[in-house]
Amino acid sequence: MALHRMLALLSLWLGLTAAFQPSRIYRRTVSSEPLPPSQDPWYSAPDNDWENTEPGTVLRVRPAPGNLTQVVGNSSAAYNILYRTTDSQYKPTWAVTTLFIPKLGSNSTAARVFNQSALLSYQVPYDSADVDASPSYSSYTAEGASGTVLFDTALSLGLFLNVPDYEGPLASFTAGVISGHATLDSIRAVLSLGLGLNTTAARVALWGYSGGALASEWASELAVQYAPDLQKTVVGAAIGGITPNVSAVLESVSGEDSAGLGPSGIIGITSQYPEVRKYLISQLKTDGPTNKTGFLAAEKLTVAEAGAAYQGVDLFDFFKQGSDILRDPKILVAINRDGIMGYHGVPQWPIFAYQSVKDEISPIANTDKLIERYCAVGANILYERNSVGSHPQEFLLSAAPAIQWLATALTGKYAQVYKTEGCTIKNVTRNSTAIPLRKRDGPNEVFNLWSKI
């Protein structure tokens, strides 16, 4: 299978019961069937003074249109929530998240095991500069619906599931700051509404792989300055296939099967910096097979479509200055602010980091350096370096251990089960024949559910 196909699969596999103040929620009439965000008027800020509200303030909420609870199994209800967040230049903007409600009731797993208090924020690696690839819409499409088995798994465990469109309204793929802000504010928005979640005792965990890990890691490092109110509520984050340095990823994928990540990533990060975007466009060639039109076409492509369109293409052939574009000071304005992890804060909650040492998209040396940086200042990290597997394969190989780690944290048993303080770095060999889950000291019902994954 071509790598871009595997990346596409990677990006895909993955009752309103609480009272709230109607005056805080602004609704707009929408079709009962889902529309792409670019065509749906619901995906817009309200015509009021929303910019002066606090980050995480809910601006609109609606039951998810169409048949989303049929597409996603084990969900009793689903809601779209539009909320105020902050872009990469620390200006007010908005984003959308989708909240899936598990099966509730006194005999449900959500009630028995978690007291309806466990919220998993899963950041989908949608890896696209097209706003219509956002999970709140793509989950309905043939491409996206085939990947909701991971949603089903989380919901079957009794977890409330938060799935943010963390790239924001400009589809700012690879822009770390807005991705982190939008992730944190989606959690704030959900906690402010409840929607069946026991918010007085809520535990929240984050999970993401590849592009989803980008959002989850940035949320974790930004929280200390941007969302200190969440530090006692968030119990941990599982991040795999981490991309600490956007430039390194662009250089790795150029000319390879996954080259489509390049145009989408550059278009995405520069969407947060209009002057940088303007300069970038001026540096694109205007003729030949790799020209401006071809490059900018990525703005309307999903990760799978971009993977097919740019497979094997040398990314730097589009630019007048070739690979030096990544070292151009005018481009570095965006990359240095928004594309390099580890310089905005230190995660204050436990981290489970995992990556293949053979990762062909994000060199593991950069992840090693990031972890070492955090370890030097007291972060609590379990880091597993898998000796086998490619970037997409590692997503599949380590999904079950990640779920185990997350569910243990959400039951409040992280310290008891994992017994790690500070940094623990392990070299592991996790392949398709390895036992994916090992029973530890946790709720039997959760382990029984894990065994069915």
List the predicted regions and their residue ranges:
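Accessory cap/linker subdomain of secreted extracellular hydrolases
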Residues: E33-P34, S44-N48, G240-H344
